[in-house]
Amino acid sequence: MALKQSNARRGHAAITSPLFAALLVVGAIFMAACSGGAAKVVTFTHGAVTPTTIVLGTDGGAIGAVRTFHADAKADDGKSGTFDATMVTTAVDAAAGLETRLTTIVFSFSDGADQLILSGSAVYPAAGSTIKTAATVVRPVIGGSGRWAGARGWAESTHEADGSWTHTFHLEP
């Protein structure tokens, strides 16, 4: 009878051993797939921007004020494109001189086939149409098309001292 138990244990070990090996292989593949790689960094620049403000009777310092921006842009690979943005004021703190604004920015290249989009809210000085120079805002990347289809990650938008802008995208692999 002891011999039969021993064979049963060996049989059980033979069944679990391939199963265990298969689980190890699947686990290794899963870990490799999830480990990803290094984030891809893409940088766009453009000159100073002047908004078109849409709120009758104000300079834009009101909830619901809409500012639109357009500028020629350049990618770090030398390609030329455009920068388009819409900014909506969603809250005003008059005592602090600050506004919360929701912004969507689209960088478009290759006649619009390649677009990278970021969107998010930030606090701005009420007196200006943009963040102060030498300041940076971080926003999520919400998508893209063409070359950047399925893009996700985050972007830093920096208002440079000379009035120009640098937008650094950190795209997940």
Predicted regions, residues:
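Residues at the start of alpha-helices and the adjacent loop-to-helix junctions
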Residues: 13, 19-20, 138
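Bacterial N-terminal signal peptides
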Residues: 18-32
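Targeting-peptide/extracellular-domain and disordered-appendage signature
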Residues: 5, 34-173
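N-terminal secretory signal peptides that target proteins for export/translocation
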Residues: 1-15
